[in-house]
């Protein structure tokens, strides 16, 4: 088509047609439609709840909290994760459809926090269970920091290639529900070594002079 013969038509086409890739179009469509699954276990989640109010208004980012992992594409872990909760967290993550993302919020989620030194039941970092996209340190992080983490995640989504992401997740999985948990022998059987228990002497063994004094 000759642009000299049809100047108005050529101008209209230039203003209404754009070329892109299917991958970029998919990333652009997901930027403002993140549906988070809120996994809060302690005080960090209270800071995230502040985003619901009118002061921060996280609806402008397209965040729609979901209660089902099958409808969510973002899981936000906030708080301490224990060994007993680890299989449930992994199951929730595996039930989310692809592509899916993870934000680790707070020191307890990232490293175990103050419980990492003397607690045998605390997971030292949620990235040992599921792959993390954005780390959000703090104890607890402020709502402004949560918004900054969501902004960084949106930038990451806009630049990613879907095939590379799937390949990296399959190679870097640290924990799956297919692992076999060995059930150890219970210690709370009631059969304790009597030698370690304090047994007060019976009254018949105490001399009578002790009572007369």
From Swiss-Prot:
Q: Which GO terms describe its molecular function?
A: 4 iron, 4 sulfur cluster binding; iron ion binding; NADH dehydrogenase (ubiquinone) activity; quinone binding
Which Cys residues form disulphide pairs? none
| Superkingdom in the source lineage | Eukaryota
Cofactor(s) annotated in UniProt: [4Fe-4S] cluster
Annotated positions binding [4Fe-4S] cluster:
43-44, 108, 139
Q: What's noted on cofactor binding?
A: Binds 1 [4Fe-4S] cluster.
Q: Name one GO cellular component term.
A: respiratory chain complex I
Q: How does it sit in the membrane?
A: Peripheral membrane protein
What EC identifiers does the entry list?
Answer: 7.1.1.-
The cellular location(s) given in this protein's UniProt record come to: Plastid, Chloroplast thylakoid membrane
* Keywords noted in UniProt: 4Fe-4S, Chloroplast, Iron, Iron-sulfur, Membrane, Metal-binding, NAD, NADP, Plastid, Plastoquinone, Quinone, Thylakoid, Translocase, Transport
The record's note on quaternary structure and interaction partners says: NDH is composed of at least 16 different subunits, 5 of which are encoded in the nucleus.
Similarity section = Belongs to the complex I 20 kDa subunit family.
Q: What does the UniProt record say this protein does?
A: NDH shuttles electrons from NAD(P)H:plastoquinone, via FMN and iron-sulfur (Fe-S) centers, to quinones in the photosynthetic chain and possibly in a chloroplast respiratory chain. The immediate electron acceptor for the enzyme in this species is believed to be plastoquinone. Couples the redox reaction to proton translocation, and thus conserves the redox energy in a proton gradient.
Protein name according to UniProt: NAD(P)H-quinone oxidoreductase subunit K, chloroplastic
Q: Which organism is it from?
A: Jasminum nudiflorum (Winter jasmine)
As recorded in Swiss-Prot or TrEMBL, the protein's gene is named: ndhK
């Amino acid at each position: 088509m000759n642009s000299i013969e049809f100047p108005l038509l050529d101008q209209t086409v230039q203003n209404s047609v754009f070329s892109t890739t299917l991958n970029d179009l998919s990333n652009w469509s997901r930027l403002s439609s993140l549906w988070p699954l809120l996994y809060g276990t302690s005080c960090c989640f209270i800071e995230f709840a502040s985003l619901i109010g009118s002061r921060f208004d996280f609806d402008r980012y397209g965040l729609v909290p979901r209660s089902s992992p099958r409808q969510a594409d973002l899981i936000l872990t906030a708080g301490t994760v224990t060994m007993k909760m680890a299989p449930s967290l992994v199951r929730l993550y595996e039930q989310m459809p692809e592509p899916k993302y993870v934000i680790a919020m707070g020191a307890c989620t990232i490293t175990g926090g103050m419980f990492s030194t003397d607690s045998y039941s605390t997971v030292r970092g949620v990235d040992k269970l599921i792959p993390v996209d954005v780390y959000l340190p703090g104890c607890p992080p402020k709502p402004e920091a949560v918004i900054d983490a969501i902004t960084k995640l949106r930038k990451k989504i806009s630049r990613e290639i879907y095939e590379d992401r799937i390949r990296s997740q399959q190679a870097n999985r640290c924990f799956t529900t297919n692992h076999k948990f060995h059930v150890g022998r219970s210690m709370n059987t009631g059969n304790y070594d009597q030698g370690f228990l304090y047994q007060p002497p019976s009254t018949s063994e105490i001399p009578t002079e002790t009572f007369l004094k």
